[in-house]
Amino acid sequence: MNWIERIINKNIVLTTKKMHVPEGIWTKCSGCVQLLYTKELERNLQVCPKCDFHMKISARSRLLAFLDQGSVCELGQELLPKDIFKFKDRKKYKDRLIDAQKKTQEKEALIVMQGTIYSMQVVVAAFEFDFIGGSMSSAVGSRFVQAVNQSLKLKCPFVCFSSSGGARMQEAFVSLMQMAKTSAALAVLYDRCLPYISVLTNPTMGGVSASLGMLGDINIAEPKALIGFAGPRVIEQTVREKLPLGFQRSEFLLEKGVIDLIVRRPDMRLKIANLLSKLTQQSFSEK
């Protein structure tokens, strides 16, 4: 044994015990695959500080971060999903609802709140993608209409964050009717000259993108969000052509004039506040 080995052996303590690291301390980025400290990721609204990849964020977390603290009042909690057709595929619809409610701790795929943003009154809604793909049911449509009505009542702007796969197939034509219902409600908002800002997040597809998602006075998207009606694979199979790189991503849509802005999630609150102050002719302080 040489002198280095003697020093090392004296200072190293061997143990057979495994170190216990609590679950949830680290999160792997879906973009760069780096391990991130979960608390830091949460502070950055689920945006990777290394590669700026926008990871999934819950609807409730999004809204609570968007509105001023202490100003929040939730709306539409009494509007719940119903198994109108006793639908069953591989699983009963009512069982899917129970599973989704347990998974997300939410009663439906749309959460509506009223409050203030930099002291400006606003009504805001957000889709919860983990609740059956953020799909639009009759209850989601009713919650959305209630949000619009509250905006009309308060004479304030309305903001909606979309993240959805489209209409909820388990409710058949009733879910498709929500496209017309929500669009008609937004037409009233437009007639009253009240601003509606639509924020399209990853993904916003199907009936949601074809109705309320694209009807904003200003349509904003998060970076690299997938936005469209049918998915790219379905389109490729239909037209039998290879689609352009980045097709249906927010950057592609901005280039084609489909959306107005791309805004990073950490910058969204201030950007929307600036837009609302101009649209409503209100001043606000960033402090």
From Swiss-Prot:
Oligomer and partners: Acetyl-CoA carboxylase is a heterohexamer composed of biotin carboxyl carrier protein (AccB), biotin carboxylase (AccC) and two subunits each of ACCase subunit alpha (AccA) and ACCase subunit beta (AccD).
Reaction catalyzed: N(6)-carboxybiotinyl-L-lysyl-[protein] + acetyl-CoA = N(6)-biotinyl-L-lysyl-[protein] + malonyl-CoA
Cellular component GO terms held in the UniProt record: acetate CoA-transferase complex
GO annotation, biological process: fatty acid biosynthetic process; malonyl-CoA biosynthetic process
Organism of derivation: Blochmanniella floridana
UniProt family annotation: Belongs to the AccD/PCCB family.
Role this protein plays: Component of the acetyl coenzyme A carboxylase (ACC) complex. Biotin carboxylase (BC) catalyzes the carboxylation of biotin on its carrier protein (BCCP) and then the CO(2) group is transferred by the transcarboxylase to acetyl-CoA to form malonyl-CoA.
Cofactor(s) in the UniProt record: Zn(2+)
Keywords attached to this entry: ATP-binding, Cytoplasm, Fatty acid biosynthesis, Fatty acid metabolism, Lipid biosynthesis, Lipid metabolism, Metal-binding, Nucleotide-binding, Transferase, Zinc, Zinc-finger
Protein name: Acetyl-coenzyme A carboxylase carboxyl transferase subunit beta
Residue span, CoA carboxyltransferase N-terminal domain: 25-287
Binding site for Zn(2+): C29, C32, C48, C51
Cross-referenced InterPro entries: AcCoA_carboxyl_beta, Acetyl_CoA_COase_Trfase_b_su, ClpP/crotonase-like_dom_sf, COA_CT_N, Znf-ACC
